[in-house]
């Protein structure tokens, strides 16, 4: 799909050489997130550690694609002439003095910059091909270097397109087989949902057509994806394989997060607007059958590990509400002194809920709730260092956002916007294991980097990898939970928020 409005290009460089990135398909009007800022890895990986193989062939890029950027094209500026200058969304390295080609190291950097503007396997969704293409041929209305390609039959355009297209069949030696899970992340400002394959840490599908997507969850059989749509106040039901929207279900108000009953029979949607509540959607008929009243607008809604209860949290009323899912009525409440933010659940050996870890507004840490006692029993503050983030990002009210218990129940992971990091604690003793720095964002015109603004957390089913959505960086960070080392930073779209794992069946 061609882009329909020009965007202002900015210089983008990634300092963490060796980390591979995959492009994503975007709406026509959505500028790629990497055009707004440059992300750098503040905790560099050792050489060769945890790196994933790129989906696009580097040697083809160097031998066939890169020469096009140096080529003289009558009546047009050379790509090299413009894209070695500052303030360019696609940046090319300056040739070494007296050389007519780039060194291998420079070509690697050119390659990394190019793949951010590419959707592997899909030339017509790749900005690298659409931006310099003539508008009448499906390109952007304006390109400062002129109409480099008059048509999609231009030999050079076809060369780049073939490089992009061939990525679908190029499998790097030693690559793992297709994984048994997918990580879904809602890009709230891009109107897309990106789907990541944990085996390659690349985007393998993009779902379009949902404005302001927020929560995401799945039917137990994995055939449906449920997305809460903030713009239309509906629940979108999406076919997982095709990405097509099957149905829109009207809600009682503006939604935030949602969850699924353990048997898959009910979708529970938190309603943020007053008076709040939890909408119940019957999964067979896809009808909203009732709204469970609670005190205050619902920011988050979860089902406990044993499936007996749903737990909602309200920012404005500061209330944590436990709903009995058999009676579909509020069973008990717990009042906090601050707004209730994300939560995570620890189970007893019999599957019942032992503790709930609750993030609160203005707290760089979390509260600990004993579920049986129906009381807060502790409050854990995250370390003061690292620090220095959150203010410029406008997130002083949410210094800690995003929390999750690993599927094996052995660790608790807690995001900190203030630290621009994620902290790991052992369970059940809550001993600090360490932290992992998240990408810094270096925007043009700013001398001091900002943080990536981590939002939400999910895991692979084997608990080996944690994924964190970075709303300020347009990316998802993958981290090895054993070594506490970053594996990959995956560009996904503008302002990624909710993130969830689907187990394929």
Question: What residue ranges belong to the model's regions?
Answer:
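Serine/threonine-rich, low-complexity intrinsically disordered segments
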Residues: 6, 10-12, 42, 306, ...
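Mature extracytoplasmic/luminal segments of secretory-pathway proteins
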Residues: 6, 76-79, 398
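Predominantly soluble domains enriched in secretory-pathway, periplasmic, or organellar proteins
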Residues: 171-505
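Sec-dependent N-terminal signal peptides
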Residues: 2-24
């Amino acid at each position: 799909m061609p882009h329909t409005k020009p965007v202002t290009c900015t210089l983008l460089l990634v300092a963490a050489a060796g980390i591979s990135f995959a492009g994503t398909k975007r709406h026509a009007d959505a500028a790629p997130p990497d055009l707004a800022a440059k992300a750098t890895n503040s905790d560099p990986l050792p050489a060769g550690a945890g790196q994933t193989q790129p989906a696009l062939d580097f040697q083809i890029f160097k031998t066939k694609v890169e020469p096009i950027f140096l080529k003289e094209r009558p009546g047009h500026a050379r790509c090299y002439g413009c894209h070695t200058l500052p303030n360019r969304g696609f940046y090319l390295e300056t040739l070494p003095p007296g050389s007519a080609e780039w060194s291998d190291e420079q070509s690697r950097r050119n390659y990394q910059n190019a793949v951010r503007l590419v959707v592997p396997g899909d030339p017509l969704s790749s900005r690298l091909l659409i931006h310099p293409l003539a508008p009448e041929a499906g390109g952007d209305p304006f390109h400062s270097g002129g109409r480099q390609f008059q048509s999609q039959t231009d030999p050079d355009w076809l060369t780049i397109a073939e490089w992009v297209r061939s990525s679908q069949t190029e499998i790097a030696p030693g690559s793992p087989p297709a994984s048994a899970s997918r990580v879904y992340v809602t890009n709230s400002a891009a109107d897309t949902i990106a789907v990541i394959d944990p085996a390659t840490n690349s985007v393998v599908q993009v779902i379009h057509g949902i404005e302001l997507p927020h929560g995401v969850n799945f039917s137990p059989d994995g055939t449906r994806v449920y997305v809460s749509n903030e713009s239309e106040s509906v629940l979108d039901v999406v076919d997982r394989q095709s990405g097509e929207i099957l149905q829109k279900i009207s809600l009682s108000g503006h939604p935030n997060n949602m969850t699924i009953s353990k048997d898959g029979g009910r979708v529970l949607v938190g309603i943020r607007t007053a008076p709040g509540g939890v909408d119940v959607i019957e999964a067979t008929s896809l009808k909203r059958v009732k709204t469970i009243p609670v005190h205050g607008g619902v920011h988050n809604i979860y089902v406990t590990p044993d499936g007996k209860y749903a737990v909602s949290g309200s920012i404005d009323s500061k209330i944590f509400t436990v709903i009995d899912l058999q009676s579909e009525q509020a069973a008990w409440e717990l009042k906090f002194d601050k707004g209730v933010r994300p939560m995570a659940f620890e189970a007893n050996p019999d599957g019942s809920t032992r503790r709930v870890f609750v993030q609160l507004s203005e707290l760089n840490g979390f509260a600990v709730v004993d579920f049986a006692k129906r009381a807060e029993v502790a409050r854990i503050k995250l370390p003061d260092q690292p620090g220095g983030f959150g203010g410029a990002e406008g997130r002083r009210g949410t210094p800690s956002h995003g929390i999750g218990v690993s599927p094996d129940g052995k660790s608790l992971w807690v995001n900190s916007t203030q630290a621009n990091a994620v902290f790991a604690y052992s369970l059940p003793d809550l001993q600090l294991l360490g932290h992992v720095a998240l990408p810094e964002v270096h925007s043009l015109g700013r001398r001091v980097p900002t943080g990536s603004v981590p939002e939400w957390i999910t895991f692979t089913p084997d608990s080996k990898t944690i994924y964190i959505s970075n709303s300020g960086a347009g990316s998802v960070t993958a981290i090895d939970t054993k070594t506490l080392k970053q594996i990959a930073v995956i560009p996904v779209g503008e302002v990624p928020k909710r993130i969830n794992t689907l187990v394929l069946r």
